[in-house]
Amino acid sequence: MLDSFKEDPNLRKLLFSGHFGLEKENIRVTSDGKLALTPHPAIFGPKEDNPYIKTDFSESQIEMITPVTDSIDSVYEWLENLHNIVSLRSENELLWPSSNPPILPAEEDIPIAEYKTPDSPDRKYREHLAKGYGKKIQLLSGIHYNFSFPEALIDGLYANISLPEESKQDFKNRLYLKVAKYFMKNRWLLIYLTGASPVYLADFSKTKHEESLPDGSSALRDGISLRNSNAGYKNKEALFVDYNSFDAYISSISNYIEAGKIESMREFYNPIRLKNAHTDQTVESLAEHGVEYLEIRSIDLNPLEPNGISKDELDFIHLFLIKGLLSEDRELCANNQQLADENENNIALNGLAQPSIKNCDNEDIPLADAGLLELDKMSDFIKSLRPEDTKLRAIIEKQKERLLHPEKTIAAQVKQQVTKEGYVDFHLNQAKTYMEETEALAYKLIGAEDMELSTQIIWKDAIARGIKVDVLDRAENFLRFQKGDHIEYVKQASKTSKDNYVSVLMMENKVVTKLVLAEHDIRVPFGDSFSDQALALEAFSLFEDKQIVVKPKSTNYGWGISIFKNKFTLEDYQEALNIAFSYDSSVIIEEFIPGDEFRFLVINDKVEAVLKRVPANVTGDGIHTVRELVEEKNTDPLRGTDHLKPLEKIRTGPEETLMLSMQNLSWDSIPKAEEIIYLRENSNVSTGGDSIDYTEEMDDYFKEIAIRATQVLDAKICGVDIIVPRETIDRDKHAIIELNFNPAMHMHCFPYQGEQKKIGDKILDFLFD
């Protein structure tokens, strides 16, 4: 088979690609390391309906399922995002990072996963498992690695090496069966290199291979993986299926089911399973539709990795499967399967002691020799078929280091840390560290960092609910959401099918907005609009003794706005006009309304959030210049540009320079200690301002005004900017200065100060409920 790839560059490229999917289980725990007895978080919806976030055996055992992707990078991004979403939505709980369980309650108190109805097949199956195996053993968690070769690769091989009169599906079945045989024979190597469950609580399991650790927990003396040993998650007795042909494979599993050894194919706990994408996952379905992918089930959670597995591990498993494809197709009889099982158990229990491996002739081979033989073969086909790939070569070298130096294995490192810190403390410390890392980047959707932050937020919230998301236009932040037959198109997170087109046009035009609101007795600032800059300049005398705002007619985000609260010169006025006309062909000059500016976010006639916006500012220290203080404040990791982070960096443009000049300051001025210097008059977060949540504190009087304004313009998702007087007695002196048809949600979700609001959830509720 190797010759087929050497001769065909297209096949060579396809060989190192594939389709990848991951399933990861984690137990939810309390802050002191006990099994969380709370229900599955309601935000994820019914387990039957969410394709991404379900439960495994227990209500406390969450399962994350990525969609099928075309690369390891993309499937890892999905896993990372799902892990982050679940972590952030599991309130006051942590995700236990080990395959072996945390502190467990009594057997009868371990909750089995709940479903829509008590007689759900999923519930009944779990009750069967609890009765047959016990509940505690079901809490062993891990990662399932789903893989299929590209269809074009199978087509190419079928054309070159299929048997006479062999159908493509029969060829495909034979191909995957061959890889499965290689995996079954050599899985001991994968367990040695990826095993990560050598430590456990003393009351969870007992084996003659264990020793006690200082904290009273237990560890396999020289072991790698309790989960993959005979003390782990196995069928009650060894089930040897016939790998000589696909039909024989199907028949042997069917015979075990008929004999009552297992209830269904779901209970066939083989380290690798042949599967197809049909949802019933019965042996009859597999027989009818044939093999579509492989499911590797023996991967432990790696507590040293935030997401339970590294990309290097994923790449190595891929290479392992490629090796299976390129290897000779050898018989895997019951005797050989028994030897393979013994090798697996021996490595799982004694791998760090480097025991010998039994070959098919029952001969002892030193572990390092046997492992290096397989790794060298992988190196050879990488050199032959992908010589330029230094990353894959480095991955193989890393595995060789682990073979030659057992202390470098994942299992040895985990055992060392648990011995030092204690079983519960080590895993809790890891879980807390990973949670802190997740919280620090809670606003981010991995792989979508180039998109607007509000888009990332609503996308994450859609994933949490199991809503399918398609990117229609990345540059335009245009998404399609689908839940069942219900489809919604959303642009920039808040432009939806609920929008009224004329309402958007009215809000886009600030002159029209003010006219319509004023006609409905809603207070707005008085002013004039100008389309000719020369005429606007000539009107200087009308405004020179007033407090005014100069702003573009139709822009958003506070761009191009200048505010004069104190006396200003003709030159200042002209510069403000230059700035405003640079953003639009028309400008508005209106009265300045004293007070504090608040953003009211109204969704479907309800105020969901209120934000006080403080203009861009720095606080002096008596040492640094204004420019240096801005540079320092902009180092905050939550500040970015183009709405990709919760806060915007403070700019040093003409608007800010003008503002400084109005205070008789420059960029080189050194403010006194604790002196606050404002760089903008307008308080938009989009121009570097600070956001403070005021939802609970805001008077209902102003909330009702915000709602009434959106109703006048028939706006369903709207940002209402209101100047609120500081004194209650003056509240009738408020004014609405703007309505926004595309309000940013991120500043409510991640304010500079105050409670974070789940605005993505509110919009999705509006769209789908």
UniProtKB/Swiss-Prot annotation:
It catalyses: L-cysteine + L-glutamate + ATP = gamma-L-glutamyl-L-cysteine + ADP + phosphate + H(+); gamma-L-glutamyl-L-cysteine + glycine + ATP = glutathione + ADP + phosphate + H(+). GO terms for molecular function: ATP binding; glutamate-cysteine ligase activity; glutathione synthase activity; metal ion binding. Pathway: Sulfur metabolism; glutathione biosynthesis; glutathione from L-cysteine and L-glutamate: step 1/2; Sulfur metabolism; glutathione biosynthesis; glutathione from L-cysteine and L-glutamate: step 2/2. Keywords: ATP-binding, Glutathione biosynthesis, Ligase, Magnesium, Manganese, Metal-binding, Multifunctional enzyme, Nucleotide-binding. Residues 1-347 are annotated as: Glutamate--cysteine ligase. Mn(2+) 1 binds at residues 721, 738. Its EC number is 6.3.2.2, 6.3.2.3. Residues 514-768 form the ATP-grasp domain. Mg(2+) 2 binds at residues 738, 740. GO terms for cellular component: cytosol. One of its GO terms (biological process) is glutathione biosynthetic process. InterPro entries: ATP-grasp, Gln_synth/guanido_kin_cat_dom, Glu_cys_ligase, Glut_biosynth, Glut_cys_ligase, GshAB_ATP-grasp, PRibGlycinamid_synth_ATP-grasp. Disulfide bonds: none annotated. Monomer. This is Glutathione biosynthesis bifunctional protein GshAB. The gene is gshAB.
